Amino acid sequence: MSSKEQEAQKGKQGWITPAVIPPEEWGTFRYRGKTLEELLNLPMDEFIKLLPARQRRSLKRGLKPEHRKLLEKIRKAKRLAAQGKKVTIKTHSRDMIILPEMVGLTIHVYNGITYIPVFISPWHIGHYLGEFALTTKVVQHGEPGLKATRSSLHIAAK
């Protein structure tokens, strides 16, 4: 299989597979000078002060009911995971801000068609869930060549 065919195959599989950093390497993580353990121990109002303005403003207004429901699901999943049971967390809340207590979980985020599994690592903190489950896919053009444009589609046949 040529390299171009391999690239096209990767595009079909989903190109947004993020590089997953193993939990053993999470010790090097710092968010605004704080380690993950420090972030987990911070009260919510102190954590909010560390976020960028858009996320800070959103959380200061309070959580929406669907976000509260998602946090309850996450806490329940963590309790069940401690007992050895595996729970799938599915959500439509693409505008939920990733909090430190979500780290280490896989949350299935709806992209309009299917649920995309998103493994939450410390580097996702402060971002929105929807950023990691794209709603559109990369355009894969057909003949007469890779990355064909409209003008080059109408090439005269020999």
Curated annotation (Swiss-Prot):
InterPro entries: Ribosomal_uS19 (IPR002222), Ribosomal_uS19_CS (IPR020934), Ribosomal_uS19_euk/arc (IPR005713), Ribosomal_uS19_SF (IPR023575). One of its GO terms (molecular function) is structural constituent of ribosome. Gene3D superfamilies: 30s Ribosomal Protein S19, Chain A. GO terms for biological process: ribosomal small subunit assembly; translation. PROSITE patterns: RIBOSOMAL_S19 (PS00323). Belongs to the universal ribosomal protein uS19 family. This is Small ribosomal subunit protein uS19. It comes from Pyrobaculum neutrophilum (strain DSM 2338 / JCM 9278 / NBRC 100436 / V24Sta).
